[in-house]
Amino acid sequence: MGMKIIAGDDVIVISGKDKGKMGKVIKVLKKKHCGKDVSFAIVSGVNVCRKSVKATQKSDGGIISVEKPINLSNIALFDSTLGIQTRVGYKFIGEKKVRFMKSSGKVIE
């Protein structure tokens, strides 16, 4: 089965410290943990942590902001036409399988 959320989607955080924040998915990460598939997403402006970087010959040291991954169960696709979170469904248009928003029925490009 395909991924419900992919890079480039507009999402909203539905639980956690950043609840209610919106952003665009930069990257989706999949890995195995204890025999199960676990998926995370890096979302712009969400779960931002500060990191100390040591000075090297090429770059100066300092404190930078880094976006950390967030579990896919904590985010939902955002429907901009209705302004609410929505679930993702799949349907066939001709021979092609496409994703669509269940709240509005709009096909996701």
From Swiss-Prot:
Subunit structure: Part of the 50S ribosomal subunit.
Record Gene3D superfamilies: 2.30.30.30
Family: Belongs to the universal ribosomal protein uL24 family.
GO molecular function annotation: rRNA binding; structural constituent of ribosome
Function field: One of two assembly initiator proteins, it binds directly to the 5'-end of the 23S rRNA, where it nucleates assembly of the 50S subunit.
Natural source organism: Ehrlichia chaffeensis (strain ATCC CRL-10679 / Arkansas)
Chain's gene name: rplX
Cross-referenced Pfam families: KOW (PF00467), ribosomal_L24 (PF17136)
PANTHER family the UniProt entry points to: MITOCHONDRIAL RIBOSOMAL PROTEIN L24
Keywords from the UniProt entry: Ribonucleoprotein, Ribosomal protein, RNA-binding, rRNA-binding
GO cellular component assignments: ribonucleoprotein complex; ribosome
Signal sequence coordinates: none
Gene Ontology BP, a term: translation
CDD domains (alphabetical): KOW_RPL26
Keyword presence, rRNA-binding: yes
Protein name, UniProt field: Large ribosomal subunit protein uL24
